[in-house]
């Protein structure tokens, strides 16, 4: 399974969605731009996408109210360690109220992995961040047992968020 992501204005991206009604494409709006997320086993309909292979997934990409993309740049040497960490993750987020889906995305044309989580609402995501399962999932962060203390990261990670577009 592949995920393709492209960015632009909501009006322009909406025309792409309308041209391809049978494709599984999400249109979402962020603070600075809009995003299309296309999940498919085939080729993408985008002209210039960021391409990813799905290496872990739970739930369906449908019509969430809120999306969180954790962008994590990983060195070539660090990829096996990073992927192993996510393949052995606690899996707690799936049981949270308002959770809809997660995709761990391996980049095909860059060094930046994306951890995509989809939620019913922004408040559901914020509630998860205050929960025990969030603390459990991140308990090894900044410890010798975690991977944050190694040099597998190319640069600091960053998070982008998006809201559903009707």
From Swiss-Prot:
Annotated ABM domain ranges read 66-153
Protein name (record) = Heme-degrading monooxygenase HmoB
Q: What is its EC number?
A: 1.14.14.18
Please classify the protein's predominant subcellular localization into one broad category. cytoplasm
Cross-referenced PROSITE patterns: ABM
Q: Which GO terms describe its cellular component?
A: cytoplasm
Instruction: Outline the subunit composition.
Output: Homodimer.
Enumerate the GO terms in the molecular function aspect.
heme oxygenase (decyclizing) activity; metal ion binding
Q: Which SUPFAM superfamilies match?
A: Dimeric alpha+beta barrel
Cystine bridges? none
Q: Does the keyword Metal-binding apply?
A: yes
For site (Transition state stabilizer), what residue positions does UniProt give?
Answer: 128
Reaction(s) catalysed by this chain's protein: heme b + 3 reduced [NADPH--hemoprotein reductase] + 3 O2 = biliverdin IXalpha + CO + Fe(2+) + 3 oxidized [NADPH--hemoprotein reductase] + 3 H2O + H(+)
Name its cellular compartments.
Cytoplasm
Under what conditions is it induced? Answer: Constitutively expressed.
Q: Which protein family is named in the record?
A: Belongs to the antibiotic biosynthesis monooxygenase family.
What is the role of this chain? Answer: Catalyzes the oxidative degradation of the heme macrocyclic porphyrin ring in the presence of a suitable electron donor such as ascorbate or NADPH--cytochrome P450 reductase, with subsequent release of free iron.
């Amino acid at each position: 399974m592949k995920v393709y992501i492209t960015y632009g204005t909501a009006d322009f991206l909406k025309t792409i969605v309308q041209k391809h009604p049978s494709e599984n494409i999400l249109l979402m709006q962020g603070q600075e731009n809009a995003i299309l997320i296309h999940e498919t086993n085939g080729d993408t309909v985008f002209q210039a996408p960021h391409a990813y292979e799905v290496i872990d997934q739970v739930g369906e990409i449908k019509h969430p109210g809120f999306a969180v993309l954790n962008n994590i740049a990983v060195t070539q040497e660090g990829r096996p360690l990073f992927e192993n960490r996510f393949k052995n993750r606690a899996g707690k987020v799936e049981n949270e109220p308002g959770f809809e889906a997660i995709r761990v995305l391996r980049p095909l044309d860059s060094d930046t992995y994306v951890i995509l989580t989809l939620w019913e609402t922004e408040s559901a995501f914020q509630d998860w961040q205050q929960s025990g399962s969030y603390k459990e999932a991140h308990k090894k962060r900044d410890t010798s047992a975690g991977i944050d203390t190694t040099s597998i990261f190319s640069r600091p990670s960053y998070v982008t968020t998006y809201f559903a577009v009707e």
